Amino acid sequence: MYKKLILCELASLAMLLASCSSHYQLTGVSRSRILIDSTYDSRPDGRAWSFIAPYKLKVDSIMSPVVGRAASYLNAERPESKLSNLLADILVWCGGSYGEKPDFAVYNIGGMRSAFAKGDITYGDVLDVAPFENKICFVTLKGSKVIELFGQIASVGGEAVSHGVNLVISKDGRLLSAKLNGKDIDPEADYRVATIDYVAQGNDKLEAFKSATGMKSPSGADDNVRQVIVKYMKAKMAQGEDIDSKIEGRIIIADK
């Protein structure tokens, strides 16, 4: 009798819970945009500012120092741009610090996430341009693979290449001509290439790098490409020189 009573009570409880449960169904979705702009600056939240202040002070002390000065606006775009030329040239420039003499350099334009405005360049500006934790990298490619690499660069409409590289590509992404320092690429020769580790792994459709040999990929904090850029800019600033670059026909899209 006692067991039957318990079973009856459990059954009643289950029915009660089932009858009280709600089954919701989504009937529609509405949304609106909340604009976050200078309107909020007129009524700052004191408590929020008090919370942020110590962190802001520390961040500003890292991001605000000036590391160089841009003589002109430097942006990144395909097939060739001032910023892409500058960063590729910096990769070649830093080779001496690693006992390297690169024949040329390649930097992916997709890794350049901002631009340098004319005037002072802060560490924070460099972080905006190069936000990823990429390291400087040196590899060797056979000439036949260099030609293949340049073909892959043509297929995406251009990447950052250093001074001395001259590519002519078609509007539909075919490599028409490739020269290095005015000479044709020797398919049998070895070429030393400066790049970043992400690109050296064959990413961004630059798969020719997967055939590279003799990789040197230092992994210290100072080997981050961002630090390499800062080092270059500080060296220029110490010499009283502004940072600048120019379009010089490294990658040309043929009219026909």
Task: Please place each PLM-identified region on the residue numbering.
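Feature captures C-terminal
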Residues: 22-37, 86, 92-94, 100-105, ...
